């Protein structure tokens, strides 16, 4: 176990102390790895928030409205007092 630890430590020290100055790429291929900000923006098009919603959001009261339309008493009350009041009077549950 000590031998393995010692070999790992020596390998790490050799890696840290090695001369890495010649590791930088040279030539025309090295410039292809990087691009300017303008070229990067052309590649990645961000979603614009101001273009409008893609799908309108559903009405949260639609299931309640459909249920109240099926009951004639609730439908009549909703025409007179509003959907929330009619639903509360008929079913006794707040929306």
Swiss-Prot record:
Keywords: Biomineralization, Calcium, Cleavage on pair of basic residues, Disulfide bond, Gamma-carboxyglutamic acid, Metal-binding, Secreted, Signal. It is found in: Secreted. GO terms for cellular component: extracellular region. The modification 4-carboxyglutamate is found at residues 66, 69. Gamma-carboxyglutamic acid residues are formed by vitamin K dependent carboxylation. These residues are essential for the binding of calcium. Residues 46-92 form the Gla domain. Disulfide bonds join 68-74. Expressed in kidney and lung, but not in bone. Ca(2+) 3 binds at residue 62. One of its GO terms (biological process) is response to vitamin K. SMART domains: GLA. It comes from the Eukaryota. Ca(2+) 2 binds at residues 66, 69. Transmembrane segments: none annotated. Residues 24-49 form a propeptide. InterPro entries: GLA-like_dom_SF, GLA_domain, Osteocalcin, Osteocalcin/MGP. Ca(2+) 1 binds at residues 69, 75. Residues 1-23 form the signal peptide. SUPFAM superfamilies: GLA-domain. GO terms for molecular function: calcium ion binding. Its main location: secreted. PANTHER family: OSTEOCALCIN. Belongs to the osteocalcin/matrix Gla protein family. Binds strongly to apatite and calcium. This is Osteocalcin-related protein. It comes from Mus musculus.
């Amino acid at each position: 176990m000590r031998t393995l630890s010692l070999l790992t430590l020596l390998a790490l020290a050799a890696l840290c102390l090695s001369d890495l100055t010649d590791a930088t790429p040279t030539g025309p291929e090295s410039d292809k790895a990087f691009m300017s900000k303008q070229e990067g923006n052309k590649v990645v098009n961000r979603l614009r928030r101001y273009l409008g919603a893609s799908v309108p959001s559903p009405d949260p009261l639609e299931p309640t409205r459909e249920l109240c339309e099926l009951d004639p008493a609730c439908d009549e009350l909703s025409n007179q007092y509003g959907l929330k009041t009619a639903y509360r009077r008929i079913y006794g549950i707040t929306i």
